[in-house]
């Protein structure tokens, strides 16, 4: 019997051990398997729902409470039109997803503005929470992003009404107009700006959006949506906010970058740096702190010191709590928008140092601005602005001029950054101006990319240009000439060419070198003040350098008579002056073209006519025979005093400087009709009747018109005049040959004398002999080496035989 009991007990123990072993196998298998690794079909729907609920639980709510909330919450369906709108927003309107944070912060700022206004008349409005802030917190573990404000909050009815529909009325009309605008290729930004749809940009990055809100007149409620439907329920946690709203985003997998602190901080500083209310981000930093040393370390040190009794007695009185330095990660709210929008204050209240500090922070420059202007524009559109002129031109200022977008002007709407991606907020020639523009009149459009289409921007642009030119005009003359003009002079010249409406204002800012002073720059106003009594034109000469311009034959008589001549030494200068029809009632005269006339008396006129009659044979001979295909006509010059002749362009032709510039254009293909027309224009050949060469030519022509030497001399004079007048020769070889012929004649060398031929060189035999000797020596050396090797081999073989 006892044996049976023992046997039964053993069976029970074996059975129990087997069950425990099976359980251990199952548990081990469950632990090792990664349940979140994949979403296999083997899972039940309840398991999936449970895992999602655990993933998106809010602070203070566990998974079961979340599930209970969803079961009891009141469900609402978006209207069909709202669904269309949602798809439009998510898929097409927002090209840049990062603006979701800008929109949420902007809405938070509006809510804070509302509660602040209410508090002015209701002293209890801020009782729930006195601080007015926006706080942003990233939760990487739960994949959540929280944006909390202490604004006015929303009641249950407002949650349904404001967040359940995109527009309270007119949604159908809006969609119809948007469809029509898209079909016509027009901008939809003006239409979108009429509807508050910024909140829905959250669905660009979130699968679900949860809004927790507390209004002073209602209990705290939770609104939740996945963009298909939404639900609202009272918050079982009670009043956790005090007052305000928390928007929680359950981010999409591809939007996980928005949980990075650096990303969030950069977006806040980019878009919301100048919001009126403080914006905080929950962030970490490493700090070094001192902590009491551990007891073990202190005991160890005491044990080591106890070896010396005297030392212990001396140090007992000096013992203090021992500390050590430890690095700790500390989490706290970090303020993001510490730079204040000084443009919101009256300019009289802002100190110069504040402008300089703001410029350095705003533009990331280390130097102070050269000039600035702070103003408020009113009228068709009201906006505030601060504009700056930098001390030096930005690098690559003219790279891709006209096609490159300028990002120096930043547009804000109610202190919310909208964009700096403009083609035409400022004209191209003012692409160096930096500043901010803040308007309350512009709509916070959904599609900021098309904002530049807005009609009010044209008004803003016009006022910005006027204020910029006023700012530049006020720069002191010394500072303007020495600094501004060196850095931005080309921009002003381009402005004269491009900006017709402001051409007169820009002309007053022009500076050029002139014959009045060897180095100082002069303005057109100063030139006009120094003009001679009967002078009715502003004279200018264009050249590659000042030296070339002032040594040109065209300015000889002008300078001799005391007229001031402006020197144009930059490639854009002549274009600039051509774009100016006149200045202060005085027209411009290019001294390298026809039209230069001097006031002369009757006696001078009679003398000139007599000279023209005297040289008529030479002039006709040049025009009809010697230079028949090269010039339009030949005339006696009034502008030459030292040079024998010059080549003068017609009033609408190219000067030598302009022709050189046009031919240097990289895109010049020769197919442009107007270019070919100007390039093919014949010039007027002017001669100096007092020059000895010209007088001798007249004598020779009268003696023999068919003299080849005289014909060659005429052509050489023409080609020399072409070069001295700034033009290029089409055939430089022919010009060189003619110069050589003239030199031969001047040295009494026969023009047909040939160049002596070089003597033929005999072949050098010594080189070949030396090569043969060298080869023979090499062969003898090789033979000698071979004999020595054979002898060594024979001796070695004999020695081996002897050993054997």
From Swiss-Prot:
Similarity field: Belongs to the heat shock protein 90 family.
Q: What's the catalysed reaction?
A: ATP + H2O = ADP + phosphate + H(+)
Gene Ontology terms for molecular function: ATP binding; ATP hydrolysis activity; ATP-dependent protein folding chaperone; low-density lipoprotein particle receptor binding; protein phosphatase binding; protein phosphatase inhibitor activity; RNA binding; unfolded protein binding
Keywords attached to this entry: Acetylation, ATP-binding, Calcium, Chaperone, Disulfide bond, Endoplasmic reticulum, Glycoprotein, Hydrolase, Hydroxylation, Nucleotide-binding, Phosphoprotein, Sarcoplasmic reticulum, Signal
Name a GO CC annotation attached to this entry.
endoplasmic reticulum
Which residues are reported to carry the modification N6-acetyllysine?
479
N6-succinyllysine modifications at: 404, 633
Q: Where is this site: Important for ATP hydrolysis?
A: 448
N6-(2-hydroxyisobutyryl)lysine: which positions carry it? 168
Q: Which InterPro entries match?
A: HATPase_C_sf, Heat_shock_protein_90_CS, HSP90_C, Hsp90_fam, Hsp90_N, Ribosomal_Su5_D2-typ_SF
Organism this protein belongs to: Bos taurus
Q: Where is the composition biased (Basic and acidic residues)?
A: 793-804
NCBIfam families this protein is in?
PRK05218.1 (NF003555)
Per its UniProt record, what Gene3D superfamilies does this chain match? 3.30.230.80, 3.40.50.11260, Heat shock protein 90, C-terminal domain, Histidine kinase-like ATPase, C-terminal domain
Q: What is its EC number?
A: 3.6.4.-
- The protein depicted here goes by the name Endoplasmin
Main site of residence? endoplasmic reticulum
Quaternary structure annotation from Swiss-Prot or TrEMBL:
Homodimer; disulfide-linked. Component of an EIF2 complex at least composed of CELF1/CUGBP1, CALR, CALR3, EIF2S1, EIF2S2, HSP90B1 and HSPA5. Part of a large chaperone multiprotein complex comprising DNAJB11, HSP90B1, HSPA5, HYOU, PDIA2, PDIA4, PDIA6, PPIB, SDF2L1, UGGT1 and very small amounts of ERP29, but not, or at very low levels, CALR nor CANX. Interacts with AIMP1; regulates its retention in the endoplasmic reticulum. Hyperglycosylated form interacts with OS9; promoting its degradation by the endoplasmic reticulum associated degradation (ERAD). Interacts with CNPY3.
* UniProt biased composition (Acidic residues): 289-317, 757-792
Segments carrying the region annotation (Disordered) are 288-323, 750-804
Q: Which Pfam families match?
A: HATPase_c_3 (PF13589), HSP90 (PF00183)
Q: Gene of origin?
A: HSP90B1
State whether keyword Chaperone applies. yes
Instruction: Give the record's GO biological process terms.
Output: actin rod assembly; cellular response to ATP; ERAD pathway; negative regulation of apoptotic process; positive regulation of toll-like receptor signaling pathway; positive regulation of Wnt signaling pathway; protein folding; protein localization to plasma membrane
